[in-house]
Amino acid sequence: MTQIYLIRHGQASFGTANYDQLSDKGQAQAHALGRYLKNLLQTKPYIVTGSMQRHQQTAQLALSEFTIEMSMYSSELWNEFNHHEVLTAYEPKLADVEFLGQQLAQCSEPREYLKTIFYPAMQQWSEHNNHGEYQETWLQFKARVQQALYELCSQIQRHQPKEVLVFSSGGVISVVVAHLLGLSAERTFALNWEIANTSVTMLKWQNEQLNLHSFNEYHYLKDNQADLTTWL
């Protein structure tokens, strides 16, 4: 049996010119994650990351809490969809990073404001399965994630690790879970919205079958510091 831990990256720099880097809080989350994993893991894990900066930063900071060197395998298949493209296709004003930053600064509940954009933007994306507006369609994104999962299972068969860490993003993790449970696009979007930064979703690979064991665990963040838990 192999336990697979799907990990969402730490808080990135949403609303800034370079989203794809961890915020100070995201870095603190990654270190807390590393301390949690150090106590959780029983063996030296097989490690996979997406190729995005936030994936690799999260992995590097988390693994810095360990006392042994560990190598990582990187694959673009585990990268997030282009959220900027999806959001701006729905609301063109969001192409201006300063506009988005101003909107968020004016909101007492920024996450609730983004929710009013996120769901219709994702719905629009899922209904447009041609290359007219999007470089990657919803169906292509799902197929890519399923390919990532297939290749991971092949690597597990080859290397026979007991534990695997995958550092990726909320959209990817939600598609994996939805694929295993047979969920609709709408339910997938709802899962994505609830996945916390540096949360851990656990799968079990046994007898050539993959099953969901737990979803979106981030209790260890609360144990470290009350305000470390974030979703944006």
Question: What do these predicted ranges mean?
Answer:
Residues 2, 64, 68, 80-109, ...:
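Acidic, low-complexity terminal tails and accessory targeting/binding regions
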Residues 3-6, 10-65, 137-145:
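Loop-to-helix element that buttresses phosphate recognition and phosphoryl-transfer chemistry
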Residues 4, 45, 162-168:
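Generic beta-sheet signal
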Residues 7, 75-77, 215:
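Conserved beta-strand termini and adjacent loop/short-helix elements that scaffold enzyme active sites
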Residues 10, 170-171, 216-219:
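Active-site metal-binding loops of divalent metal-dependent hydrolases
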Residues 34-116:
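Phosphate-coordination/substrate-recognition cap region in phosphate-metabolizing enzymes
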Residues 51-52, 77, 164-171:
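Short, well-ordered beta-to-alpha junction loops that form the rim of enzyme active sites
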Residues 100-140:
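Short glycine/proline- and acidic residue-enriched helix-loop micro-motifs
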